[in-house]
Design a protein with these regions (language model features):
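Conserved AdoMet/S-adenosylmethionine-binding subsite of the radical SAM
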Residues: 1-146
Length: 146
């Protein structure tokens, strides 16, 4: 069993999950006020507040990584040094080995993701991380509910 989580809550189970896939939400994921979401809703203050409520719950993340020892860290990188610094700070803070770090390209369309692949590939080679795609977006582009 694999659980995909942003780490907002510690998932207490009777036994450790086979694999935790941890994708924390950094500040580059905060919705922009007034834009339309992929679901067709306009981002308002309430949505931003809800997004930020548990965005980086370090206590829950620490508990999760201690209890579920088989995990990987899958942050989304938007190509900026600022986000790369946050990714590395988080990794070091939580003592996550580089070989458990899988960088995903930022983007919510097939075209945007493909445009990021070379940059992400070069960065992970330079920093000793792994790269993973976002295959659901490559396969279905902006289609929802797949």
């Amino acid at each position: 069993v694999t659980i995909e989580t942003e780490g907002s809550h510690f998932l207490e189970t009777d036994y450790p999950i086979d694999l935790i896939s941890l994708s924390p939400k950094f500040s580059n994921t905060i919705p922009k006020l007034g834009i339309e979401t992929p679901a067709g809703k306009i981002v308002d203050e309430r949505m931003i507040k809800q997004h930020n409520k548990f965005r980086l719950n370090h206590d829950a993340i620490s508990q999760t990584l201690k209890y579920h020892s088989d995990y990987h860290y899958k942050p989304v990188w938007d190509g900026t040094e600022k986000t790369l610094d946050k990714i590395e700070f988080f990794r070091v803070t939580h003592n996550i080995p580089k070989d458990k770090t899988y960088i995903m390209p930022a983007g919510d369309t097939r075209e945007t993701l493909i445009g990021m692949y070379k940059k992400v590939f070069e960065m992970v080679a330079e920093h000793g991380y792994n790269m993973t795609g976002r295959d659901h977006i490559i396969a279905y582009d902006t289609e929802r509910g797949v």
